[in-house]
């Protein structure tokens, strides 16, 4: 008797379909972000990975309660598929400007609406899809920092999502 062929199961709305929500470039960018957060490179993001990631961004005194709340957003261990699913759920129906602003807010723990030029430049030239010196030069020409060396990220977010600078009233 010949072995039965296994039927392919499809899960509608399940985690296996999360890969269809994003194109290959986006998935690769999420993979790079996952790798940056997975500090110990074990393929799972845990509380210590989050703590180390915050420390790398200069935020040293993150409370356990805050980390626990982040970990509870997942139903179990956070591997790449779970990570992608979590982002897919958060991004579904979200305003792109709000999503991008939210990403910048992570880098602005004091909620000032600005990020230090030096810190942003370091991130953009050393992490994931690295900016060239020419791209950095163009960015500062388009979004010059203030006299204190701070960059208004809300204007950057607006331009990314709308293609033109906000009118200063």
UniProtKB/Swiss-Prot annotation:
Ca(2+) binds at residues 38, 40, 42, 49. It comes from the Eukaryota. The modification N,N,N-trimethylalanine is found at residue 2. The keyword DNA repair does not apply. The modification Phosphothreonine is found at residues 25, 35, 101. GO terms for molecular function: calcium ion binding; structural constituent of muscle. Expressed in fetal and adult skeletal muscle. Disulfide bonds: none annotated. The modification Phosphoserine is found at residues 15-16, 75. Signal peptide: none annotated. GO terms for cellular component: cytoplasm; cytosol; lysosomal membrane; muscle myosin complex. Residues 25-60, 95-130, 131-166 form the EF-hand domain. GO terms for biological process: actin-myosin filament sliding; muscle contraction; muscle tissue morphogenesis; skeletal muscle tissue development. Keywords: Calcium, Disease variant, Metal-binding, Methylation, Motor protein, Muscle protein, Myosin, Phosphoprotein, Repeat. It is linked to Arthrogryposis, distal, 1C: A form of distal arthrogryposis, a disease characterized by congenital joint contractures that mainly involve two or more distal parts of the limbs, in the absence of a primary neurological or muscle disease. DA1C patients show multiple congenital contractures, scoliosis, short stature, and segmental amyoplasia. DA1C inheritance can be autosomal recessive or autosomal dominant. PANTHER family: MYOSIN REGULATORY LIGHT CHAIN 2 (PTHR23049). Myosin is a hexamer of 2 heavy chains and 4 light chains. Myosin regulatory subunit that plays an essential role to maintain muscle integrity during early development. Plays a role in muscle contraction. This is Myosin regulatory light chain 11. It comes from Homo sapiens. The lineage of its organism: Eukaryota, Metazoa, Chordata, Craniata, Vertebrata. The gene is MYL11.
């Amino acid at each position: 008797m010949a072995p039965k062929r296994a039927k392919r199961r499809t899960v509608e709305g399940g985690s296996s379909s999360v890969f269809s929500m994003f194109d290959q470039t986006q998935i690769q960018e999420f993979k790079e972000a996952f790798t940056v957060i997975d500090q110990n490179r074990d393929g799972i993001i845990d509380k210590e990975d989050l703590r180390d990631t915050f420390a790398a961004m200069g935020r040293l005194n993150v409370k356990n309660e805050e980390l626990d709340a982040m970990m509870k957003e997942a139903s179990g261990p956070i591997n790449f598929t779970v990570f992608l699913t979590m982002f897919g759920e958060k991004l579904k129906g979200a305003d792109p400007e709000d999503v991008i602003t939210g990403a910048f807010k992570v880098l602005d723990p004091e909620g000032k609406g600005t990020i230090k030029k030096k810190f942003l430049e370091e991130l953009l030239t050393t992490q994931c899809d690295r900016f060239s010196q020419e791209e950095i030069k163009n960015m500062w020409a388009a979004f010059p920092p203030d006299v204190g060396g701070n960059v208004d990220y809300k204007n950057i977010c607006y331009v990314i999502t709308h293609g033109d600078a906000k009118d200063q009233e």
